Amino acid sequence: MLLLKTIPAGNDALATRSAQVLFVFLPLSLATFVGMYFLDFSFFGKHPYVLPLGLLMVDLAAHLFGVFYGGKRWLILGSFALSPLALSLLFPLAFCGLFYRLRSQGRRGYLISGVLAAVFCLFLSYCHTFSGVLTFVFSAGVLMLVASKKKWFDKQRNMFLLLFLLAVVCLIVLLMFYAPFRYRYGWERLYTVFVPSGDPMGSGYLSTQLKTVLSHSVFLGEGAAVSGTQAYLLTDASMLRSDYLLAYLTYHYGWVASGIVVLLLAVFLGLGFRKALKQKSIFGQMVSLTILCTFTAEILLYIPANLGIWLIAPIALPFLSYGATALFINMALAGVLLSVFRTGEVYRDTAPHPIFSDSKFIQWADGKLTISFK
């Protein structure tokens, strides 16, 4: 009920958009959730190229025919705009299928996975957003660490842990030194994390206003009166109704309301990880851990942003934010997750098929020319 009350009313553009999300995209997302629930999740392991190629085609179409907005290309399909920020949520699952198929290559497959993860990060940084990069790094990093500990690629676990840590260090260094130069206000945003009041009318403006609004919030109920600037941020036309939904709930209904939302999400993640780690199949564990890590990264990015730590823009609060693309994708991921929990107990891993075969199409040996069509 609290969340339904945050739906804007009126005839403005935000109210119209929110009505579309509630009455059009929400039923469509629920239908997608049901469809993904009954889909055999092994599809992503048997056909690991489908999702990455699909994302590549969408990005190509957005680059050629999309509308430039907010520094990125948006693909417009009628009244539906594909958000590049939300589309980045699918990249961890796309990597998961390829990572599973690379098991057949042993140590070489693990190294190739690290290179592939770096390529994904660079692609996300150019075609999507820095939030998507961090979400992917977290999800892929956890997946590679679990694979190393459980010896899914090779029996020499310590070697893979060392390679994993080295890859993480390289990615962190890359992101730290690359991002501020890649984005115009990178250094200013980094500065506002520590001293948001240093530039209250510039890059630290939103952070300062959010902290002021939260300082007027109470334990339960409506917050104390704020100035005209903060009051404007809390109107129906404000982004506090979408990207900063927790801050909105905290001010209007108290810290208890936002605490309940965070607690429910924490319980969902806790039960999900507990179920995921009990999966008997390797691919079932991979898919479930990847999706749960994606949800976790979304929440970990969303909460600090709502507390006024404005380093990067949040992607979405899973299942609750108004964004049509984010809602659609999160519901689809939840459907795949429950599909794993539904059939994961009976699913058995098949022998991995190598992506890179050692056999040659044409061979010359002992004066004989052999052509293999296998």
Describe the residue ranges of each PLM region.
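A structural signal for hydrophobic alpha-helical transmembrane segments in multi-pass membrane proteins
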Residues: 1-69, 325-342, 346-355
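Transmembrane alpha-helical segments and their membrane-water interfaces
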Residues: 15-48, 89-104, 142-151, 270
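Membrane-interfacial helix-loop-helix modules of multi-pass inner-membrane proteins that assemble, modify
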Residues: 43, 57-82, 181-192, 228-230
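Hydrophobic alpha-helical transmembrane segments
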Residues: 48-69, 121-125, 167-176, 294
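A juxtamembrane structural motif centered on a specific transmembrane helix
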Residues: 111, 301-374
